[in-house]
Amino acid sequence: MAKKQSGQPLTAEQKRQMRRRRSRRRAVLRGIALVLVCVIVVLLWQNWDVVAPDRLYSHIQDLLGSSTGSYPVDFSGVGVQRLARVDNYSVVLTDSHLIYLNQSGAEVNRISCAYPSALMCTTDQYVLVAEQGGRRIQLSTRTSVVTEMEVDNEIIAVALNDKGQMAVLMQGSQGYLVQIKVYDRKGKLLYTRSRNQTATEIALSPDGRQVALLSIKALNGTLTSAMDVFSLTTSDTEALCSHKEADTLLYRMEYLSDGWVVAFSEDRAVMMDTANGLASVYVPSDMRVLGYAVGSDTMALVLRSYGSTGDGEVHIVNKEGVPTATIPFEGVYRDLSQQKGLYVLLTDTYAQRITANGEQVRVSVEEDGRQAVLDGDNVVVLGLNRLLSYPLT
């Protein structure tokens, strides 16, 4: 059949075919658009605590200086339990609220949180508060409460990672001594396990693939502490790796980066590589551990000689248990914290910023300081009943 000449009118059949082709194209485009809308809606729902408009609005408010208030911040008549650093804000946990303060000391948000005996974990974005000996937990961000729930039994310890995943160590049931549960940031149960061990501490890996349990038991009259690591991605009930320290009471445990977990006692730090179960132990000579802080690749230990009542040293130690810096300090130790690889030491007379290489800057502070965090080039110190900010020069 000869082709239709240019300019020749289309037949009715040709017009119908063109309409059908256009209709099919429109249907395909509508289907693609619908899928994209569904994907966007799901992503927004899953990450609303991160992308919520009020979060952006709050930051704009701070930039424009619409929040009022300044340092020092008075907390007279209010019981202040903890000071932390979250999402570039200083966060104060009181008897009744989580209070967020910007760099000027202005209050930018407060979240109701009235737990009589509170445990608090923080990451760069999330704050987890749990009722020790109770059953309530609350996960929040700078702008809102993400999850508020009750667990099955009394809480012993909690842990939190950067994804907002929460690990809860609680009293056991049905004949077990303890129960471990891990939830996502929305409160969905990801993992549960019961153990017949006297467990005291729990830690959650940054990637959410492992949970570590610290337990104690007596073997042949000797107290032994055990570090056990379990997989959250398999159904295996046995530990991936374990390490035991005889005649030692390990009392705190945290994850570093790259699958390393560290635990502390009065006289040592124990680092275990969960990839192979090999552990290294750092035991400072004739000194006891007063405090610690954990970064991504290093940790800092506050040490004091046995028999001494003042002065001491801060040791920066890497994952292999090798000290990389030693910093002497004077006075009475009060607090040690870590933000983004920098440590801040607080004594009764000064605060000191310390890098992983041992570089340091100090500033004199009032004598009633209890806790300290870094705020850019300032250090924020919690005293008996007020919060003060000091420039590090």
Which residue stretches match the model-derived regions?
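Hydrophobic membrane-insertion alpha-helices, especially the h-region
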Residues: 29-46
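A short beta-strand motif characteristic of beta-propeller blades
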Residues: 62-75, 104-112, 143-150, 187-194, ...
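Solenoidal tandem-repeat scaffolds enriched in leucines and small polar residues
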Residues: 176-270
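Repeated scaffold domains used in trafficking and secretory/extracellular systems
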Residues: 70, 74-84, 113-125, 153-162, ...
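Hydrophobic beta-strand positions that form the internal "hydrophobic ladder"
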Residues: 90, 127, 166-167, 208-211, ...
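N-terminal Lys/Arg-rich, disordered targeting/topogenic segments
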Residues: 1-27
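Non-cytosolic head/periplasmic domains of membrane-anchored proteins
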Residues: 109-214, 221
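Structural motif
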Residues: 48-49, 97-99, 135-139, 175-181, ...
